[in-house]
C-alpha cells in the first residue's frame, strides 16, 4: 500500500473576493501538473468586534463598534510532483492574503 502525500494550503484574508480569486488561481496552476485537487473548501468566517468610547473623557454610554471578518479557504493537493511545488513557489500572492502550507 503506497503512502499518499498531500499538501494543505490555507488562505486567509479580510477580503472574501481576494481569497476566492487566489484560490482559483492556485487550482488552475495545480491542474496543469495533473495533481489531484480538493477544494477550495470554505472554512468558517470569524467576525471580530471592537468597542471603543467615542469621547475620551465623558459619556461612557456613547460607544462605537468596529467589526471585521476574516475569511478562510482550504485547498488539498494529493500526490504533488516536484513540478507542482515549483509552480506553487513561483506564484506571487498579494500582501492581503496570508498563506499557510502544511505537508
Curated annotation (Swiss-Prot):
What InterPro entries does this protein's entry cite? Answer: Ribosomal_uS10 (IPR001848), Ribosomal_uS10_CS (IPR018268), Ribosomal_uS10_dom (IPR027486), Ribosomal_uS10_dom_sf (IPR036838)
Q: Which keywords describe this protein according to UniProt?
A: Ribonucleoprotein, Ribosomal protein
Q: Which family does it belong to?
A: Belongs to the universal ribosomal protein uS10 family.
Swiss-Prot/TrEMBL GO biological process terms = translation
Query: What name does UniProt use for this protein?
Result: Small ribosomal subunit protein uS10
Keyword Zinc found = no
**SMART domains, per this entry?**
Ribosomal_S10
Q: Name one GO molecular function term.
A: tRNA binding
Q: What does this protein do?
A: Involved in the binding of tRNA to the ribosomes.
Which PANTHER family does this UniProt record tie to the protein? Answer: 30S RIBOSOMAL PROTEIN S10 FAMILY MEMBER (PTHR11700)
* The organism's place on the tree of life at top rank: Bacteria
Oligomer status and interactors:
Part of the 30S ribosomal subunit.
Q: Which terms in the GO cellular component ontology are assigned?
A: ribonucleoprotein complex; ribosome
Amino acid at each position: 500500500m503506497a503512502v499518499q502525500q498531500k499538501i494543505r494550503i490555507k488562505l486567509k484574508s479580510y477580503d472574501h473576493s481576494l481569497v476566492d480569486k487566489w484560490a482559483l488561481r492556485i487550482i488552475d496552476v495545480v491542474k496543469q501538473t495533473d495533481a489531484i485537487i480538493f477544494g477550495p473548501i470554505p472554512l468558517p468566517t470569524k467576525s471580530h468586534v471592537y468597542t471603543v468610547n467615542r469621547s475620551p473623557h465623558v459619556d461612557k454610554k456613547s460607544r462605537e463598534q468596529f467589526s471585521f471578518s476574516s475569511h478562510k479557504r482550504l485547498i488539498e493537493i494529493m500526490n504533488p510532483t516536484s513540478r507542482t511545488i515549483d509552480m506553487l513557489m513561483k506564484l506571487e500572492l498579494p500582501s492581503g492574503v496570508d498563506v499557510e502550507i502544511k505537508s
